[in-house]
């Protein structure tokens, strides 16, 4: 159609032609649109024609006009989509007025749907506006019908903008409008999940203001609840946690145990619980005030309502998580002085126990101690409520054995009220055993009940005694044997009152005359009672010195009724006498260690930490020659003792450093020091385990072995309660077992490796050896074969026997038959030989040896360890003569195990057991049969030992000198020491009465090759101070290193990391040199703890033995890597370790974004806007831009960096932004370019939306070549980030910046990278409380460190760090340090001198900074340096100036990062 025809048609429509003619003309035009294209010049004329035709009121002409207009739009959509996109508002207005017409409404709705594809927001806004402002009900209805059509056509319109219009029309006066609006709401939300539906209902309740009837109708239609009402849900949910049947019986004893009436509260969705808990947390922070106590009470009440609702059924995991988060606040409310708040918290805990039952078992460790505190208060209301709650917990949740431990604490408390409550709890547990169905558990813990009842029957409070009498008879009903056992141990007065309280006692007869008298007891009872009184008298007379038997401290029963005074502080902690050669500057402390709980205040721990740092600094200055005075001896004694028992990991990192250990040896009682130190070494769950383990070699080298032997022996005797004057130690039974384990291993180590060299020393005399052996032999009677301490004990005795066999056999003959058989049988199974005693020397020694017993008391009721010789002597067992060597080591079949996990701690949880004992039954051992194969094996080992000895002798001085480059004098020393260590046991074995080869922990034989290795001491590897210290270390025999065993041209690939003899995992330490690879073995945890001070090294740096003698040999030490095959190496919980004191106890709330920049932020004096004048962003000029961008964007990049965000939230958001239909550049290039330019404009104007950012990200991701057509995208992104504060859009812009840099990094120069970093740092300072923005900033800075030019970026970072002032900003320093660590990860070596200078400057400046973020970033820099050099010692030398505490912290941080990777 020509231009003239379009003009003629317009004139025809304006003329007065008839309607039929106009209709025919429109039909002809419609047919033309279906078959032909529309000329571009005629578009405006046709639009004007339709504007005129659609304004008519004639229905026939209007219907033809709408039909022709629909065809016209269909042709435009195919021919001119771009033209149509920008004319949607004009075309929409032509037909939207006819939406209410019955004949035209269907076509009009279809036209609007066609226009929606080109401009969705315009169509939606117009319809929403029309639905709320139109006075025509039909118009509103048709607007809603359009949304129904759009929903059925799966068009993603904006529901959030539509909801307010629907809420308004739900209140419309026209019922048809209300129904249509309701239908749209139901259509949108009926297919969603229940949680989404409940979220919608919650929003309607809070924002819409609808009437209750309308809201109830919506809820019913969405099928959320039944039509009856929501009360049905509450009743059904409440019925599911009705109290158990036995609660009725409990209610008879405790009337207040029933649940109170509380209005239930429904949880609509899981997020509701988390949102409510987040709003409750601020109320429980800080101290209780007049303003927040009511808020706390409301929070507690709301939790009780949730428990009564559906949360415990539908959202149990979320509810438990909320309760765990709020548990500290609930306990604060429990201990409140306000009775109202405290009672509410008590009721909450009671309802938790009744409703949640065993689900709250993990919380009981915190709840029960605090409940005991409330039970002991004088407020009757609070104490009685706590009493009832404790009873409810006992019958509903928790393990009986663990609950009994808390009841035992209450029963032994000085508060009479608490003892009365505990007696009632015991009676309840016993009497309700059938209802609780725990008779089996009751029988398992029968001993604990018997102890509590025996103590309660003699309690000073009459109420307590009365209840325990009832408990006694109730327990006797279920276990009749208990009555006979307990009555034999009770006093007559107690038995008399107990008999009177017997419920089954027959009533006395009154039909007799005469005075009343007590019943006549049988003669047998009288005899047994007289005998027990004699034994008790003799026991009291012999035990007057306070000696106690093996086991826990027991209350001695005095012979008279006089009151026994407790130990005084000085008597209870009697100091061990030190050898005369020990330092005598100050006498050791005799103060009792502070028994502070782990829950000590943060302020006190921080004060202790700072105090230790000051003491360490002063002591190091004194060592360096400065004139500084230490505090007084009393001050050092008390504070070092408190720090030793503080239980804080940060304090242990200092107290177990070498300098403070020296002070601790001088000012703290050595028994207290060694007992606590051994506990830390052998308890992997202790927070000081890793630090004590690292310092163990240094502690061993502090004194000579012959001086340590009596000290460790005294600790062993005191811990096992076998000393004449027992000291009081603040340890429980399990801890004492661990200390005993460590003492036995240490004594055996000294006996095996050191005492052979002391035959001419004053220590090595027969009398002392006899004394030590007799005392240790006494421990065999109370140590069971299945105990973890049995193998170390038997190994120690076997080692002591090797020094003087004649004397030891005499002691062994005096031992009772049972203990002697058990010990000898254990030796035979361990070392594969029979043992027989000789009657010739038995008679000789029996006259001179003292009588040996397991305790100092002479109680005749106990079995003596030594069997008296004479007529009553039993027939001796015939055994062969022992074949042995002086080494006397245990065979490899009996490798002494060190503590692994908490196996030692789990042997016996009862406090009443001896720490040397085990609860397991003894094994029956057979020590009379010898397998012939073991004898053959012995001969084979003897032959191997001879061949190995010949090879070792072949290593002469010249060989050492040639192989290791040592001087002749050094070779002599080394050759002598090495051969002593290597061939000493072998030569002794060969020269002894039999040729038996004993295994050492650091030996492995592969085929015919003998391999050895040497690991230096951790003390020397961690801190090599100067030549004086090295020389001093050489002079000390104990700290020279391990047994020097060198490899003899062995292929190291054949070495295994598992000890073939014991099956224990080893830590493999590999060191490679250019000429000859060398592989060393790192001993596992059990061998580290059981070996001498010189026999192991836990440092991850490998050294050769000649490094101790020549500094020049350090060059041959290559890079090493440590493979952690043993998880028990440094088994410190991560939550117990931190880089500073503020990070130990400071609670950091977890944010949705895991960003190292988030968390607790230290307060600052002034905000920092910029570091200095940040240069404005300068874009490239046109020529430079064309040069770079033509190179980068002329064709799609085939090489895309694989750099993904490390933050999970950002990565998820990026994937969500990338979803959608791909961009088709071939067909819509002009449109895409226009859209990209529009996006740049929106970014510059600050009016960008999510859809625009999503489009830009897809452009960068899918079609990077389009970036060539837009020169201002990067400046626009940076401008928007710098000038806007919308968190969501800023985070999306940071994602866009990430994608732009990944795809277009080749076109960005270094100056632009500098500007980007400056803008990001400035933004981080402004948005330091926005974790999402901080995570995006960190991601982009890390990306820039990966893609930018390394030299230019390093120079920029160096300049910024040197001019940085951390006092005016909080985020600048962490970000720059993070950038520096990322730059270092790209380096292969630190070849520039200025690099090392910068690292020293940065680390020394920020490693002790008050801001935890800066400290963590500094340790990451240290970690990056260690990754480059792959050598911890070289890392310390590069950083320089780090003290021992900082080095230990870095070692622990390195281990923590290694565990995270694994």
Curated annotation (Swiss-Prot):
Biased composition (Basic and acidic residues): 870-896
Coiled coil: 1342-1367
Gene Ontology cellular-component annotations: cytoplasmic microtubule; cytoplasmic microtubule minus-end; cytosol; kinetochore; microtubule associated complex; microtubule cytoskeleton; microtubule organizing center; mitotic spindle
Low complexity bias (residue ranges): 538-552, 574-589, 847-866
SMART domains: TOG (SM01349)
GO BP: any one term: cell division
Chief place where the protein resides: cytoplasm
Modified residues (Phosphoserine): 599, 1221
Cross-referenced InterPro entries: ARM-like (IPR011989), ARM-type_fold (IPR016024), CLASP_N_dom (IPR024395), TOG (IPR034085)
A matching Pfam family: CLASP_N
TM regions (residue ranges): none
Organism domain of life: Eukaryota
Disordered: region residues: 528-563, 573-592, 838-928
Location(s), subcellular: Cytoplasm, Cytoskeleton; Cytoplasm, Cytoskeleton, Spindle; Cytoplasm, Cytoskeleton, Microtubule organizing center, Spindle pole body
Keywords: Cell cycle, Cell division, Coiled coil, Cytoplasm, Cytoskeleton, Microtubule, Mitosis, Phosphoprotein
A GO term, aspect molecular function: microtubule binding
Assembly mode: Interacts with microtubules. Interacts with dhc1, mal3 and tea1.
Known function: Microtubule binding protein that regulates the stability of dynamic microtubules. Required for mitotic spindle formation.
Family per similarity comment: Belongs to the CLASP family.
Protein name in the entry: Protein peg1
Organism: Schizosaccharomyces pombe (strain 972 / ATCC 24843) (Fission yeast)
This protein's encoding gene: peg1
């Amino acid at each position: 159609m020509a231009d003239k025809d379009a003009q003629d048609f317009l004139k025809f429509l304006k003329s007065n032609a008839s309607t039929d003619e106009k209709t025919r003309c429109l039909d002809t035009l419609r047919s033309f649109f279906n078959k032909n294209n529309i000329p571009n010049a005629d578009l405006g004329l046709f639009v004007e024609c339709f504007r005129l035709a659609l304004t008519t009121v004639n229905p026939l002409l209007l219907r033809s006009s709408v039909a022709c207009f629909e065809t016209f739009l269909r042709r435009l959509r195919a021919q001119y989509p771009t033209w149509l996109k920008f004319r949607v508002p004009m075309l929409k207005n032509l037909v939207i007025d006819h939406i209410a017409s019955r004949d035209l409404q269907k076509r009009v709705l279809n036209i609007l749907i066609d226009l929606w594809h080109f401009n969705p927001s315009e169509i939606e806004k117009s319809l929403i506006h029309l639905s709320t402002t139109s006075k025509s009900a039909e118009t509103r209805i048709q607007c809603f019908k359009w949304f129904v059509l759009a929903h059925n056509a799966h068009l993603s319109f904006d529901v959030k903008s539509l909801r307010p219009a629907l809420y308004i029309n739900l209140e419309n006066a026209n019922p048809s409008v209300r129904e249509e609006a309701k239908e749209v709401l139901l259509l949108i939300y009926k297919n969603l999940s229940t949680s989404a539906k409940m979220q919608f209902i919650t929003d309607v309740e809070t924002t819409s203001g609808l009437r209750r009837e309308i809201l109830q109708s919506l809820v019913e239609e969405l099928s959320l609840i039944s039509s009856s009402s929501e009360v049905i849900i509450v009743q059904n949910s409440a019925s599911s946690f009705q109290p158990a049947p036995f609660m009725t019986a409990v209610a008879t004893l405790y009337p207040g145990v029933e649940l109170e009436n509380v209005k239930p509260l429904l949880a609509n969705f899981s997020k509701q619980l988390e949102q409510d808990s987040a709003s409750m947390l601020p109320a429980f922070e800080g101290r209780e005030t007049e303003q927040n106590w009511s808020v706390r009470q409301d929070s507690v009440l709301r939790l009780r309502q949730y428990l009564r609702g559906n949360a415990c059924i539908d959202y149990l995991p979320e509810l438990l998580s909320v309760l765990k988060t709020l548990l500290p606040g609930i306990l604060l409310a429990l201990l409140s002085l306000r009775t109202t708040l405290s009672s509410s918290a008590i009721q909450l805990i009671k309802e938790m126990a009744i409703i949640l039952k065993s689900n709250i078992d993990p919380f009981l460790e915190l709840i029960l101690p605090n409940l005991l505190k409330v039970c002991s208060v004088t407020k009757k209301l609070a104490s009685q409520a706590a009493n009832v709650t404790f009873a409810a917990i006992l019958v509903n949740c928790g393990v009986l054995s663990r609950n009994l431990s808390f009841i035992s604490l209450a029963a032994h408390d000085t508060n009479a009220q608490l003892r009365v409550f505990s007696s009632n709890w015991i009676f309840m547990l016993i009497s309700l055993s059938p209802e609780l169905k725990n008779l089996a558990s009751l029988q398992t813990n029968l001993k604990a009940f018997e102890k509590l009842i025996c103590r309660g029957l003699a309690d000073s409070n009459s109420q307590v005694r009365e209840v325990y009498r009832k408990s006694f008879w109730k327990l006797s009903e279920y276990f009749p044997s208990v009555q006979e056992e307990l009555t034999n141990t009770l006093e007559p007065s107690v038995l008399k009152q107990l008999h009177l309280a017997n419920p089954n006692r027959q009533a006395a007869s009154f039909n007799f005359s005469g005075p009343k008298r007590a019943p006549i007891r049988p003669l047998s009872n009288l005899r047994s009672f007289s005998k027990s009184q004699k034994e008790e008298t003799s026991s009291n007379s012999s035990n007057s010195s306070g000696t106690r038997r093996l086991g826990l401290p027991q209350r001695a029963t005095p012979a008279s009724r006089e009151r026994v005074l407790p130990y005084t502080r000085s008597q209870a902690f009697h100091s061990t006498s030190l050898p005369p050669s020990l330092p005598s500057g100050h006498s050791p402390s005799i103060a009792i260690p502070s028994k502070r709980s782990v829950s000590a205040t943060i302020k006190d721990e921080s004060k202790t930490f700072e105090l230790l740092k000051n003491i360490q600094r002063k002591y190091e200055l004194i060592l360096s020659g400065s004139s500084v005075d230490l505090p007084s001896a009393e001050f050092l004694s008390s504070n070092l003792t408190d720090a030793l028992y503080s239980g804080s990991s940060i304090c242990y990192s200092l107290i177990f450093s070498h300098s403070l250990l020296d002070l601790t040896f001088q000012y703290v009682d050595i028994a207290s020091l060694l007992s606590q130190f051994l506990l830390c070494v052998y308890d992997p769950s202790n927070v000081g385990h890793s630090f004590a383990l690292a310092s163990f070699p240094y502690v061993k080298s502090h004194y000579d072995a012959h001086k340590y032997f009596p000290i460790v022996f005294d600790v062993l005797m005191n811990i096992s309660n076998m000393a004449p004057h027992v000291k009081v130690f603040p340890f429980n039974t399990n801890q004492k077992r661990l200390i005993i384990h460590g003492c036995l291993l240490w004594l055996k180590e000294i006996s095996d490796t050191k005492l052979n060299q002391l035959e001419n020393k004053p220590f090595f005399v027969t009398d002392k050896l006899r004394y030590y052996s007799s005392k240790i032999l006494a421990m065999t009677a109370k140590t069971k074969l299945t105990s973890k301490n049995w193998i170390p004990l038997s190994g120690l005795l076997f080692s002591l026997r090797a020094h003087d066999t004649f004397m030891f056999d005499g002691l062994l003959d005096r031992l009772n038959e049972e203990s002697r058989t058990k010990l000898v049988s254990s030796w035979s199974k361990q070392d594969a030989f029979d043992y027989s005693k000789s009657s010739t020397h038995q008679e000789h020694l029996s006259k001179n040896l003292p009588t040996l017993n397991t305790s100092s008391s002479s109680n005749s009721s106990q079995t003596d360890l030594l069997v008296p010789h004479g007529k009553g002597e039993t027939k001796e067992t015939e055994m062969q003569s022992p074949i042995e060597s002086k080494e006397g080591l245990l065979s490899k079949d009996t490798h002494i195990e060190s503590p692994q996990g908490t196996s030692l701690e789990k042997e016996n949880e009862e406090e009443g057991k001896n720490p040397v004992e085990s609860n397991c039954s003894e094994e029956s051992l057979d020590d009379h049969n010898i397998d012939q194969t073991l004898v053959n094996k012995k001969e084979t080992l003897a032959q191997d030992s001879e061949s190995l000895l010949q090879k070792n002798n072949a290593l002469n001085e010249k060989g050492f000198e040639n192989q290791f480059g040592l001087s002749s004098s050094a070779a002599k020393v080394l050759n002598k020491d090495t051969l002593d260590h290597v061939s000493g046991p072998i030569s002794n074995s060969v020269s002894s009465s039999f040729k038996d080869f004993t295994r050492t922990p650091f030996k492995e034989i592969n085929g015919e090759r003998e391999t050895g290795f040497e690991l230096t001491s951790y003390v020397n590897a961690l801190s090599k101070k100067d030549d004086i210290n090295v020389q001093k270390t050489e002079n000390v025999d104990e700290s020279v290193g391990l047994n020097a065993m060198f490899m003899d041209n062995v292929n190291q690939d054949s070495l295994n990391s598992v000890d073939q003899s014991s099956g224990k995992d080893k830590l493999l330490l590999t060191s490679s040199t250019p000429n000859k690879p060398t592989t060393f073995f790192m001993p596992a945890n059990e061998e580290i703890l059981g070996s001498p001070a010189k026999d192991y090294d836990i440092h991850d740096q490998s050294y050769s033995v000649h490094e101790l003698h020549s500094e020049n040999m350090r060059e041959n030490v290559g890079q090493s890597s440590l493979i952690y095959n043993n998880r028990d190496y440094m088994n410190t919980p991560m939550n117990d370790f931190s880089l500073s004191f503020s990070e130990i106890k400071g609670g950091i709330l977890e944010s949705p974004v895991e960003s190292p920049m988030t968390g607790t932020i230290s307060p600052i004096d002034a905000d920092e806007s910029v570091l200095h004048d940040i240069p404005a962003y300068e874009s490239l000029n046109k020529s430079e831009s064309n040069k770079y961008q033509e190179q980068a964007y002329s064709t799609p990049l085939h090489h895309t960096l694989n750099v993904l965000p490390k933050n999970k939230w950002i990565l998820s958001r990026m994937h969500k932004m990338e979803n959608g239909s791909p961009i088709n550049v071939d067909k819509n290039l002009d449109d895409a370019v226009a859209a990209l330019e529009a996006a740049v404009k929106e970014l510059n104007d600050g009016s960008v939306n999510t859809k625009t950012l999503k489009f830009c990200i897809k452009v960068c991701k899918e079609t990077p070549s389009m970036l060539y057509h837009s020169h201002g995208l990067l400046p626009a992104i940076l401008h928007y980030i710098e000038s806007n504060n919308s968190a969501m859009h800023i985070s999306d812009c940071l994602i866009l910046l990430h994608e732009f840099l990944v795809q277009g990094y080749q076109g960005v120069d270094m100056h632009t990278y500098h500007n980007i970093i400056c803008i990001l740092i400035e933004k981080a300072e402004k948005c330091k409380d926005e974790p999402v923005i901080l995570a995006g900033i960190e991601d982009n800075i890390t990306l820039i460190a990966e893609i930018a030019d390394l030299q230019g970026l390093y120079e920029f970072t160096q300049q910024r760090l040197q001019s940085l002032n951390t006092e005016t900003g909080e985020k600048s320093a962490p970000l720059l340090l993070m950038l520096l660590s990322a730059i270092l990860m790209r380096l292969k070596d630190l070849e520039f001198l200025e690099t090392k200078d910068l690292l020293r400057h940065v680390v020394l400046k920020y490693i002790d900074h008050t801001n935890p973020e800066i400290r963590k970033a500094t340790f990451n820099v240290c970690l990056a340096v260690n990754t480059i050099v792959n050598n911890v010692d070289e890392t310390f030398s590069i950083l320089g100036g780090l003290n021992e505490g900082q080095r230990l912290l870095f070692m622990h941080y390195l281990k923590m990062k290694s565990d995270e990777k694994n």
